From Swiss-Prot:
Function: Formation of pseudouridine at positions 38, 39 and 40 in the anticodon stem and loop of transfer RNAs.
Entry GO MF terms: RNA binding; tRNA pseudouridine(38-40) synthase activity
Keyword Isomerase found: yes
Enzyme Commission numbers on file: 5.4.99.12
Entry binding sites for substrate: Y109
Protein name per the record: tRNA pseudouridine synthase A
GO biological process: tRNA pseudouridine synthesis
Family, similarity comment: Belongs to the tRNA pseudouridine synthase TruA family.
Gene: truA
Catalyzed reactions: uridine(38/39/40) in tRNA = pseudouridine(38/39/40) in tRNA
Keywords: Isomerase, tRNA processing
NCBIfam families assigned to the protein according to its UniProt record, in alphabetical order: hisT_truA
Subunit structure: Homodimer.
Organism, scientific name: Burkholderia multivorans (strain ATCC 17616 / 249)
Active-site annotation: D51 (nucleophile)
């Protein structure tokens, strides 16, 4: 039997998603809790591995088990053994054809950026921060150069294990609400550090360090050294993973973050 789970977690509390010998990752915490509840070891497969400090709103995993339990029992039972920084939001029995990673056709990330002369301790680990003003229109113009199918080698980390740097970036939406800038990135898939590297370049343009068409030159050059430094992880959230309708994967519980209303007019599953 294949079970899918929707997971939310505070990435600031963990050293990324993927299991490590020290055991302080989201996968480690989840698999320990599953083993406690199921009384047998269970291995999870994830839709997308997130880095240290990156949060999960709509993360999806699957695992195989011989245990026959009601879907919601997996939610309550697993949550009973999870730390406060991780929670299972839903569970659903799936056909064997479902795969958390390979069945997904798109991923959406949000980035929350606090733009203010003084940092806020209340936002530590929850939002990125920059103390200088940003030009929204310049960043939108730069973002337009990045849309479509491209070789994103200039925006991947040296540790990226993706088989190809070619990805299709469907959307970059930038919205300002008060002192916050909210970014929405949607693509078929992302490279390691790709969103944070895109953020670094957009912010550099927003600060006036480069013209908007500079990002087109960076993209065409396929050289990571020509791009801006990797931006901080604090404000980055894996918000949604898209699957074919046949699997009826429940939507992410975006209402659990205070700024979710920014995207209220957008379909969570485009």
């Amino acid at each position: 039997m294949r079970i899918a789970l929707g997971i939310q977690y505070d990435g600031a509390a963990f050293c990324g998603w993927q299991a490590q010998p020290h055991g302080n990752t989201v996968q480690d915490a989840l698999e320990r809790a599953l083993a406690e509840f199921a009384r047998v070891p269970l291995h999870t497969t994830v839709a997308g591995r997130t880095d240290t400090g990156v949060h999960g709103l709509g993360q999806v995993v699957h695992f195989d088990t011989e245990l026959d339990r009601a879907d919601f029992s997996w939610v309550r039972g697993t949550n009973a053994f999870l730390p406060p920084t991780v929670a299972v939001q839903w569970a659903k029995s799936m056909p064997d054809a479902f795969h958390a990673r390979f069945s997904a056709f798109e991923r959406t990330y949000y980035y929350a950026l606090y733009v203010h002369p003084v940092r806020s301790p209340m936002l530590d680990g929850r939002a990125g921060w920059i103390h200088t003003p940003l030009d929204d229109d310049a960043m939108r113009a730069a973002a337009a150069h990045l849309l479509g199918e491209h070789d994103f080698s200039a925006f991947r980390s040296s540790e990226c294990q993706s088989k190809t740097p070619v990805k299709h970036l469907y959307e970059i939406d930038i919205r300002r609400v008060g002192h916050f800038l909210h970014f929405r990135f949607r693509a078929n898939a992302f490279l390691h550090h790709m969103v944070r590297n895109l953020m670094g370049c957009l912010v550099a343009v927003g600060r006036g360090r480069y013209p908007a068409d500079w990002v087109a030159d960076v993209l065409a050059g396929r050289d990571r050294n020509r791009a801006a430094p990797t931006f901080m992880a604090d404000g980055l959230y894996l918000a949604h993973v898209g699957y074919p309708a046949e699997f009826a994967v429940p939507p992410a519980q975006l209402g659990s973050v205070p700024w979710s209303s920014v995207w209220a007019d957008l379909d969570p599953q485009p």
